[in-house]
Amino acid sequence: MSQRTVVIASRVGLHARPASLFAQAVAASGAQVTIGKPGEPSIDASSILMVMALGIGHGEEVVLESEDDGVLDQLVTLLETDLDAE
């Protein structure tokens, strides 16, 4: 299992629109991906409600895990983008 640590760039964190775009990208990838705060349990990253429930704010770190390195790289790029600005 590979993992990546990324800092959330969206101004409101992973809430509403950014969480939706992220969860949709995970689901579309077809890969099993988890997300969580460092040192805390991870959840299914394809669930928008679970992602929003993490309460991840702007500038916070999250850890992504998956068997698919390519998907992880794409998701890191997505989270490093201010999804509220698009």
List the model feature ranges, each with a label.
Residues 1-5, 61:
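Intrinsic-disorder/low-complexity, polar/charged segments enriched in Ser/Thr/Lys/Arg/Asp/Glu/Gln
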Residues 4-7, 66:
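Long, low-complexity, intrinsically disordered polar/charged segments
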Residues 52-86:
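C-terminal structural segments of small proteins and small subunits
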Residues 7-56:
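Compact, glycine-rich, soluble single-domain proteins
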